[in-house]
A protein has these predicted regions:
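Short, charged, surface-exposed secondary-structure boundary motifs
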Residues: 31, 64-69, 82, 111-113, ...
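Active-site-adjacent beta-strand anchor residues
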Residues: 54-57, 165-166, 274, 299-300
Length: 343
């Protein structure tokens, strides 16, 4: 028998006292830990050496190490298969014994150099639900990029510089790639660090100037408009507030949350376009149908309402939500899990 639980560390799969944690939020005392990708909300600080065996991709491991997370060597175990989740470079879902599939953060849309997720058949599906509400339906990638290019073209015609805003790891590399035809292209130094890592793994990043070099060379003060790619944050933030005020730049944010108009106003952006590295609601339904599971567990975001909607569609779904002071515990019949000894 197999327990699927949510505790203070996150989602855990337990069989006869042997535990596998899925993207824990802090270091657990467990046999195995799966890290799906290198966003900081899926990484944990390794406080002590306790023999944790880490299952993750080489790319995720390298990016995590670069960001200051020390995990030692990664570990491969029979019965566990990493499958591209399409979220960011190196991101993976985990297929356990060909029967249980954990998505991690997932996208089934091809975006620039990012391939769509590989979704297997599985009896049990543990699926993220960040945008698991029917209100969150995204336009296709190409139309979003086209809209952004129209805005940039208009601003360049008027001599106005433009700031594109996206997450430092993942979104910013896509922005660097798809808007590389605009010159001069300037990239925030923190994004440049991630771009260099992507280049090491074969993703071509065309020539650009870092923000610090552009500032030193006085490029920002020239009469020629420029395009800056920077980490997404509120325009009330000191850096963006300074750039907008000094150079008269306009801002374009990219996020799945931009489906709602309040997001643009909350961050004080001039424009905001729906572009996400997650599945939208319809994509999540597509993942479920392709996986065709007997049992579904939803986690993160709209976990409860998404599970309810899946049940209305004829699936058997429950949210994995930790109740305060309690373990949300579910018994799963999957006797083959952890029955084989470690190699």
């Amino acid at each position: 028998m197999l327990d699927v639980c949510v505790d203070n560390y996150g989602i855990t799969v337990d069989n006869k006292g042997k535990k596998l944690y899925l993207d824990p939020n802090r270091q657990p005392d467990s046999d195995l830990i799966f890290i799906s990708h290198a966003h900081t909300d899926h990484l944990y600080k390794c406080i002590k050496e306790n023999g944790n065996k880490i299952i993750t991709s080489k790319i995720t491991h390298k990016i995590a190490m670069h960001r200051g997370y020390k995990y030692g060597e990664t570990f491969e175990q029979h019965g566990f298969e990493l499958l591209n989740s399409g979220h960011i470079l190196g991101s993976n879902g985990l297929l356990i014994e060909d029967q249980m599939y954990y998505t991690g953060d997932i996208s089934i849309r091809k975006r620039a150099f990012m391939d769509a997720a590989v979704v297997p058949k599985a009896k049990i599906l543990i699926i993220e639900s960040t945008f698991g509400h029917p209100e969150y339906v995204f336009p296709n990638f190409e139309s979003t990029i086209h809209k952004a290019n129209l805005i940039i073209s208009e601003m360049y015609h008027r001599g106005i510089p433009v700031i594109l805003l996206g997450y430092t790891l993942g979104k910013a590399q896509i922005l660097t790639n798809v808007f590389r035809h605009w010159k001069p292209l300037i990239v925030h130094d923190s994004i440049d660090e991630m771009n260099k890592l992507y280049s090491e793994f074969g993703v071509s990043m065309d020539s650009y100037v870092t923000f610090s070099d552009a500032e030193r060379s006085d490029m920002l003060s020239s009469r020629q408009p420029w395009l800056l790619i920077a980490p997404i944050t509120s325009c009330k933030n000191g850096f963006l507030k300074y750039i907008k005020k000094k150079y008269g730049a306009i801002s374009i944010g990219f996020s799945g949350w931009a489906v709602k108009s309040y997001y643009k106003y909350a961050l004080g952006l001039d424009h905001c376009l729906p572009l996400s590295d997650h599945c939208d609601y319809n994509d999540l339904i597509s993942v479920v149908k392709k996986c065709n599971p007997e049992k579904i567990y939803t986690f993160h975001g709209f976990a409860e309402s998404f599970a309810e909607n899946l049940n209305l569609l004829g699936f058997d779904a429950d949210p994995l939500i930790r109740k305060r002071g309690k373990r949300n515990k579910t018994i799963v019949k999957l006797d083959t899990f952890f029955t084989k000894s470690d190699p």
